[in-house]
Amino acid sequence: MYPHLVSLGISEPEKIERYSLRQEAHKDILKIYFSKQKGELFAKSVKFKYPRQVKNVLVDSGSHRYKETTEINRNLTLIIDELNKITRPEKETPTDVKKKILKDLRHLEKVVASKIEEIEKDLEKL
């Protein structure tokens, strides 16, 4: 019933609770969260990275100028379609979008802080 999710190794798609999708550099990061099982402290999740497809788009036909742009991987769109059938996400309001952007910003801050700390430790070793 969900061939693309099964191809990812998800044997029980009905246990999917929600998912998130974000873009980092030239990759889309899909994270799938499963329903928390009895006795588990945290709900299980899996993460997948998909490279964005690079396309050259004609900007000006007179000068034959092209612009490089990226778009979501076709396989990822098929997976998202299946995930939407399972999770039936609600439409996002402008407030939801603002919260998502702030959440992504906080996540980026943590990633950068962690990387800075890692580099500083490497410097101390020298």
UniProtKB/Swiss-Prot annotation:
Domain of life (superkingdom): Bacteria
HAMAP family cross-referenced by the UniProt entry: UPF0325
UniProt record similarity statement: Belongs to the UPF0325 family.
Name the record gives this protein: UPF0325 protein VF_1965
